[in-house]
């Protein structure tokens, strides 16, 4: 097997094309490809471009809605709730972070909740960006199915890292 090195832009474009071919909308494919390429660039290979084949298969199988458009509500002054509408997580993350960025100057703290999303990947990268750029504390939550059993139990109860 040979290895080929791609630029960030080329890797991002290749991933976006694979997602588009599998049923993702243009914006969702672009945002997802960017996030996956960025995870690899930041050394988080487990949540990087290696996810493209699985995401593409899940799009083709209808497990995730490629044309979903996230909706945003503000349940309180310092919080944002995003419904990903069973779509890819990254458009929802982008929507939540954009809202949070516009609100953080007013309260110093913003919580972003994302529900009904696909795999949120390296969510912490986006939360770190918001905190660094705004000079404020930032936290994000997303749902996750039970996959981890508490100590001493054989029954899964906790999700996998749903807080960033």
For each predicted feature, which ranges?
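N-terminal amphipathic, basic helical "cap/leader" segment at the start of enzyme domains
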Residues: 38-47, 51
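Active-site cofactor/substrate anionic-group-binding motifs, chiefly glycine-
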Residues: 48-101
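Flexible, glycine/charged-enriched surface loops at secondary-structure junctions
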Residues: 24-31, 46-48
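Short glycine-rich or small-residue beta-strand-to-loop segments that form or flank ligand, phosphate
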Residues: 18, 81-85, 110-115
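Generic N-terminal amphipathic, Lys/Arg-enriched alpha-helix
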Residues: 1-22
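Glycine-rich anion/phosphate-binding loop at the beta-strand->alpha-helix junction
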Residues: 109-164
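Glycine-rich phosphate/diphosphate-binding loops that line cofactor/substrate pockets in enzymes
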Residues: 26-27, 101-106
